[in-house]
C-alpha cells in the first residue's frame, strides 16, 4: 500500500477495474434478487457543448451519491446518460470552424464522455443515447405522424416571433425584453406556416396533476407551471358592429369578441383595445398611415405577457366603434401595444376604473373612467384609485343599472345570463397556455416527416420510410437553412399519394421534442421495432429527476405533455414521468472587472487578483497581482467563460482528483442551495481525503494484530475505550443514514468527518477488542464515504482486506446500526443542590432510583456543598439530573 495518497493512481486503477467488470450495467430484475425493487435516478441530459462545467459536476455527483447509496440499500438502480445533441450552437460552431455540425457534436460527445468517466460516475453506458442519431429521432418522427393521425399535431399559419440573426422562430418563452434569448437580436413578428401540437387539449390534466399528484416536486416549480398553464374562468362575449371589408362583408361576422374574468365590471367599459394584428386594426390601418406606422412599431415590441405588463402602454385610435352588448352605447376601438393576438380573441374591453393596465392607458390618452364597483361599501375618488385597487377585495356593483347592489359572483352570473339570452356571450374557461409550435427553420434538428406535393399539398411520409435522415455533410453559412438547397435531401422524393416528384419539408423540430422523452428511451435504447417497450413498464415513472430550475417550465411541462400523449397512444401506462424532482443550486464564483483600454469591460480570473477587505473582513475591492492596479469586485455570480470566473473540472480533477471535486461540491452547500466557490475549501476537502488515506496506512501497518483478532473470530470483549468508539461511530452512522435518505449530502460529508475524528482520537491499547472495534469502524467509514468518494473508498477497502472478507465494495451492503453499541455502560447525570448546579454524578446505565440517590449522596460535589448538613429530600429525573434539598 502506498504511504502517500496519489489520487491519479487511485482513481485510474479503480476506474479501470469498474470498466473491465462492466460494473454499472443494469438489467430489469424480475427474479427478486434486489429485495427493495427498482429505483430510476436520472440527471437532465447535457448539451454536448465541448466540456463539462462545475454545474455538471455538481448535478452528476448528486445523482451518483444517490445511486451508490441506494444500491447498497438493496435497490436495482438505473443511472443512465445521453446527449441532447441537436441545436443552434452546433450550427454556429460549424460556421465558425467550417466543419459539419455532426462532426463537431460527436467530437464533443467523445470528450465529455471521457470527462464523466474520469469523475467515476456509476453510469450504465450501455443505455447511452444521442438525440442526433437517426435510431433515436426516427421515433420523434414516428410519434409526430401518430399525433397527426389523432389531430394532436396540425399545420397553421400564425404570427410568430422571428429572430433575424438565427433566422428561426422563437417561442414566447425564448424572447426576453423583445430580444432573442440567444442572439440578443430585436425580435420581429412574421406570419409563417408551421406545425403545432395541441398541448392545450391537456391543459386541465396538466394543471390538476401538478397541483395534486406531484408532492415530490418543489413547491416553487409546481407554482411556476401552474401559473404558466394559467387557468382563467370568466365570460366570452361580443361587441357588435357594422364594419365591413373592401368586399362589403362584415368583418368577423359583425362581432368583436373579448374575454374577461370580471364580467361584473362590464358596465364600466369606456373603450376597447385590439392587438396590432387584429382584423379591425388592419382594416383601419389600410386608410390611416399613422396607424399603419404604429402597427409596424408594435411588431418590434415585447411578445410575452410579462414584457407587455412592464413596457410603456401605447395606443392609437382606429376611428372605429363597436356597440356595447348591454347598454347599446358606442364604444371606441383603439389599437394597443399591450394586447396579444395570440391570447384569447386579440381584443380586450377597457375598464379603467377597475383594471391597472386600463387605468394607465386611459389616464395617458384622456379616456373616460367610470367606477362600477364599490369596495367595502365605500365610494372612492379616482385619485385614490391605486389604494383600493391594490386591496383587490370583492365589492358590490354600483352605477350598473339593474345590477346595482349585486356582489361579484352574483353580478357575473347575471351579466353572463343576459349576454347568453342575447346570443352574444357565455361563460368560458380560458388558458394562458398556448399550443406548442414545433417547426424551426434550422438544419441541425429532427426533419419533420412531411412531403410537399404541388397537387396534394403537405403529405405525411409513410411509416415504412422512416427515419427521414438528416444529411450529415451540411456546413451552414448563415444564409438560411441549407436543407432548402441540398439536392440529396430532395433527390428521388415523390408524393406518397400520386407518385409525382415532390420536395421534403425543410423545417426541423424544436429541440425540446428531443428532450421530452429521452428518459423513456433509456429504458429500452436498442429497440429498433418500438419506441418504448417492456423496459419502460419496469423503470417508469422515474423515481428521482435532477436538474436546474431554469427548466421548470419548458422542458418539464413538455415532458409531462409528451408522457400523456404516449399514454393515450397506448405506449406507456403512467400519467406523470417524474415522481420526485430536485433542482440543484447554481455554482457561483467571484467576478472582477475594470474598464479596458478600448472602453469595454475587461474581466479577470480570481487567481489574477488579490482581494481588499474592510475592517469586518468583507471584500470591498481587489487589485491585479501583475500590475497592482485596482479592479472592481462585482460580488459573486454564475460561473461563465465571458466573465473569466469559471473553474475547469478537468484542471481540478488532475490537480486534486475526482473524489476531491465530488466531496467539495457536496460538502459546501445543500444540493438545492447555491454553491459559492472557495479555493481554500477545495484544499480542505483534499486534506480530509489525505487524512483518511493516512489512517488507512496506519491500519495496514497494524494488520498483523488485526489479522490475529480476525482469526480469533473477533470474540474478544470490547474494552471501555472500544465501547465508546463503537457508540460514537454507530450514533453518527444513524445520522448519516438519515441524511442520505433526505439527500442532504453536505451533512453526510460532515458526518463522515466526525467518523474520522472519532477514529483518530481513539487510543489503540493493542487489545484484540480494540483491533476489532477499529476494523469495524473504519469499514463503516469507507462504506459511508463510498457514494461521495468511490475511488478512495474502493482502494482502501481492497488494501485493508475488507474485499477479501466481505466482497467488492460495489456489492457491499449498507452498514447496519448496532442498537447494542448505542447503549452506554454508565451515564452522567447533572447534580443540583437546592436547585443549583453543583457538578455531576456517574452511575451505571439503567441504575434504579436507590442506586442513583446513594451515588449522589456519596459524591464529592454534594459532600463539599452540604458541609455536613443532612439531605431533606432527593429528587431524581431519570436520565437527566439529581436534585438534593438540604
Swiss-Prot record:
Sequence motif 'HIGH' region, residues: 46-56
Q: What SUPFAM superfamilies has UniProt attached to this entry? A: Anticodon-binding domain of a subclass of class I aminoacyl-tRNA synthetases (SSF47323), Nucleotidylyl transferase (SSF52374), ValRS/IleRS/LeuRS editing domain (SSF50677)
- Keywords recorded for this protein, A-Z: Aminoacyl-tRNA synthetase, ATP-binding, Cytoplasm, Ligase, Nucleotide-binding, Protein biosynthesis
Q: Which InterPro entries match?
A: aa-tRNA-synth_I_CS (IPR001412), aa-tRNA-synth_Ia (IPR002300), Leu-tRNA-ligase (IPR002302), Leu_tRNA-synth_edit (IPR025709), M/V/L/I-tRNA-synth_anticd-bd (IPR013155), Methionyl/Leucyl_tRNA_Synth (IPR015413), Rossmann-like_a/b/a_fold (IPR014729), tRNAsynth_Ia_anticodon-bd (IPR009080)
Which residues does the annotation say bind ATP?
A: 641
Q: Which GO terms describe its cellular component?
A: cytosol
Example GO molecular function = leucine-tRNA ligase activity
Q: Kindly list the places in or outside the cell where this protein is found, as annotated in its UniProt entry.
A: Cytoplasm
Biological process annotations from GO: leucyl-tRNA aminoacylation
Say which domain of life the source belongs to: Bacteria
Q: Where is this motif: 'KMSKS' region?
A: 638-642
Enzyme class, one word? ligase
Q: What is its EC number?
A: 6.1.1.4
Q: Which reaction does it catalyse?
A: tRNA(Leu) + L-leucine + ATP = L-leucyl-tRNA(Leu) + AMP + diphosphate
Q: Which Pfam families match?
A: Anticodon_1 (PF08264), tRNA-synt_1 (PF00133), tRNA-synt_1_2 (PF13603), tRNA-synt_1g (PF09334)
Under NCBIfam families, the record lists: leuS_bact
Q: Which family does it belong to?
A: Belongs to the class-I aminoacyl-tRNA synthetase family.
The protein here is known as: Leucine--tRNA ligase
Native source species: Polaromonas sp. (strain JS666 / ATCC BAA-500)
Q: Which gene encodes it?
A: leuS
Amino acid at each position: 500500500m502506498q504511504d502517500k495518497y496519489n489520487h491519479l493512481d487511485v482513481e485510474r486503477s479503480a476506474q479501470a477495474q469498474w470498466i473491465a467488470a462492466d460494473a454499472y450495467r443494469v438489467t430489469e430484475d424480475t427474479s427478486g434478487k434486489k429485495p427493495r425493487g427498482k429505483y430510476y435516478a436520472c440527471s437532465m441530459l447535457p448539451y454536448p457543448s465541448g466540456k463539462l462545467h462545475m454545474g455538471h459536476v455538481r448535478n452528476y455527483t448528486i445523482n451518483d451519491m444517490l445511486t451508490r447509496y441506494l444500491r447498497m440499500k438493496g435497490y436495482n438502480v438505473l443511472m443512465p446518460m445521453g446527449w441532447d445533441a441537436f441545436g443552434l450552437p452546433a450550427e454556429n460552431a460549424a460556421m465558425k470552424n467550417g466543419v459539419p455540425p455532426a462532426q463537431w457534436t460527436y467530437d464533443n460527445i467523445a470528450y465529455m464522455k471521457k470527462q464523466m468517466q474520469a469523475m467515476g460516475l456509476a453510469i450504465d453506458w450501455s443505455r447511452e443515447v444521442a438525440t442526433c442519431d437517426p435510431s433515436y429521432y426516427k421515433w420523434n418522427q414516428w410519434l409526430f405522424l401518430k399525433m397527426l393521425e389523432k389531430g394532436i399535431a396540425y399545420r397553421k399559419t400564425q404570427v410568430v416571433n422571428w429572430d433575424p440573426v438565427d433566422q428561426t422562430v422563437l417561442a414566447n418563452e425564448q424572447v426576453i425584453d423583445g430580444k432573442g434569448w440567444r442572439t440578443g437580436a430585436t425580435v420581429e413578428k412574421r406570419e409563417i406556416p408551421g406545425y403545432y401540437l395541441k398541448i392545450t387539449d391537456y391543459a386541465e390534466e396538466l394543471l390538476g396533476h401538478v397541483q395534486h399528484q406531484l408532492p415530490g416536486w418543489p413547491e416553487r416549480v409546481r407554482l411556476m407551471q401552474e401559473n404558466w398553464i394559467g387557468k382563467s374562468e370568466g365570460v366570452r362575449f361580443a361587441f357588435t358592429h357594422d364594419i365591413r371589408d373592401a368586399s362589403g362583408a362584415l368583418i368577423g361576422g359583425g362581432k368583436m369578441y373579448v374575454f374577461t374574468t370580471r364580467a361584473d365590471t362590464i358596465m364600466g367599459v369606456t373603450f376597447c383595445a385590439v392587438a396590432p394584428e387584429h382584423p379591425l386594426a388592419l382594416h383601419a390601418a389600410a386608410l390611416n398611415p399613422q396607424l399603419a406606422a404604429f402597427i409596424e412599431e408594435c411588431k418590434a415590441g415585447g411578445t410575452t405577457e410579462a414584457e407587455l405588463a412592464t413596457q410603456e402602454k401605447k395606443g392609437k385610435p382606429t376611428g372605429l366603434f363597436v356597440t356595447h352588448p348591454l347598454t347599446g352605447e358606442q364604444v371606441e376601438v383603439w389599437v394597443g401595444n399591450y394586447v396579444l393576438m395570440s391570447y384569447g380573441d386579440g381584443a380586450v374591453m377597457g375598464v379603467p376604473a377597475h383594471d391597472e393596465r386600463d387605468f394607465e392607458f386611459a389616464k395617458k390618452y384622456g379616456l373616460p373612467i367610470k367606477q362600477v364597483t364599490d369596495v367595502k361599501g365605500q365610494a372612492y375618488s379616482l385619485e385614490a384609485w391605486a389604494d383600493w385597487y391594490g386591496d383587490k377585495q370583492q365589492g358590490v356593483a354600483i352605477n350598473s343599472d339593474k345590477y346595482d347592489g349585486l356582489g361579484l359572483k352574483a353580478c357575473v352570473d347575471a351579466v353572463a345570463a343576459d349576454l347568453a339570452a342575447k346570443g352574444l356571450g357565455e361563460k368560458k374557461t380560458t388558458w394562458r397556455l398556448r399550443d406548442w409550435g414545433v417547426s424551426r427553420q434550422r438544419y441541425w434538428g429532427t426533419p419533420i416527416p412531411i412531403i410537399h406535393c404541388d397537387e396534394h399539398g403537405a403529405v405525411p411520409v409513410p411509416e415504412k420510410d422512416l427515419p427521414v435522415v438528416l444529411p450529415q455533410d451540411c456546413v451552414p453559412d448563415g444564409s438560411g437553412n441549407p436543407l432548402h438547397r441540398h439536392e440529396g435531401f430532395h433527390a428521388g422524393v415523390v408524393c406518397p399519394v400520386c407518385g409525382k416528384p415532390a420536395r421534403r419539408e425543410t423545417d426541423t423540430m424544436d429541440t425540446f421534442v428531443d428532450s421530452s422523452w429521452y428518459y423513456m428511451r433509456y429504458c429500452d435504447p436498442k429497440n429498433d421495432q418500438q419506441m418504448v417497450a417492456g423496459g419502460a413498464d419496469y423503470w417508469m415513472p422515474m423515481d428521482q429527476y435532477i436538474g436546474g430550475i431554469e427548466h421548470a417550465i419548458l422542458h418539464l411541462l413538455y415532458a409531462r405533455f409528451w408522457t400523456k400523449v404516449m399514454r393515450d397512444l397506448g405506449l406507456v401506462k403512467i400519467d406523470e414521468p417524474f415522481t420526485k424532482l430536485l433542482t440543484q443550486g447554481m455554482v457561483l464564483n467571484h467576478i472582477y472587472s475594470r474598464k479596458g483600454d478600448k472602453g469595454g469591460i475587461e474581466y479577470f480570473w480570481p487567481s489574477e487578483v488579490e482581494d481588499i477587505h474592510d475592517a469586518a473582513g468583507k471584500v470591498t475591492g481587489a487589485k491585479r497581482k501583475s500590475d497592482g492596479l485596482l479592479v472592481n469586485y462585482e460580488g459573486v455570480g454564475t460561473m461563465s467563460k465571458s466573465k473569466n470566473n469559471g473553474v475547469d473540472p478537468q484542471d481540478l480533477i488532475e490537480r486534486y482528483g475526482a473524489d476531491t471535486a465530488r466531496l467539495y461540491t457536496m460538502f459546501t452547500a445543500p444540493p438545492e442551495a447555491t454553491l459559492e466557490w472557495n479555493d481554500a475549501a477545495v484544499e480542505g476537502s483534499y486534506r480530509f481525503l489525505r487524512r483518511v488515506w493516512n489512517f488507512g496506512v496506519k491500519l495496514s501497518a497494524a494488520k498483523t494484530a488485526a489479522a490475529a483478532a480476525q482469526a480469533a473470530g473477533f470474540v474478544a470483549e470490547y474494552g471501555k475505550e472500544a465501547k465508546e468508539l463503537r457508540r460514537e461511530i454507530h450514533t453518527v452512522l444513524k445520522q448519516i443514514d438519515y441524511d442520505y435518505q433526505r439527500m442532504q449530502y453536505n451533512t453526510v460529508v460532515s458526518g463522515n468527518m466526525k467518523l474520522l475524528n472519532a477514529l483518530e482520537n481513539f487510543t489503540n491499547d493493542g487489545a484484540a477488542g480494540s483491533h476489532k472495534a477499529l476494523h469495524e469502524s473504519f469499514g463503516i467509514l469507507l462504506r459511508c464515504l463510498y457514494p461521495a468518494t468511490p475511488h478512495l473508498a474502493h482502494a482502501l477497502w481492497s488494501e485493508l482486506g475488507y474485499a477479501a472478507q466481505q466482497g467488492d465494495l460495489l456489492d457491499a451492503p449498507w452498514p447496519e446500526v448496532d442498537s447494542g453499541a448505542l447503549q452506554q455502560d454508565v451515564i452522567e447525570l447533572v447534580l443540583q443542590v437546592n436547585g443549583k448546579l453543583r457538578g455531576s454524578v456517574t452511575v451505571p446505565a439503567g441504575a434504579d432510583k436507590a442506586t442513583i440517590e446513594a451515588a449522589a449522596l456519596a459524591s464529592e460535589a454534594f459532600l463539599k456543598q452540604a458541609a455536613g448538613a443532612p439531605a431533606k429530600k432527593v429528587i431524581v429525573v431519570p436520565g437527566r439530573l439529581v436534585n438534593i434539598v438540604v
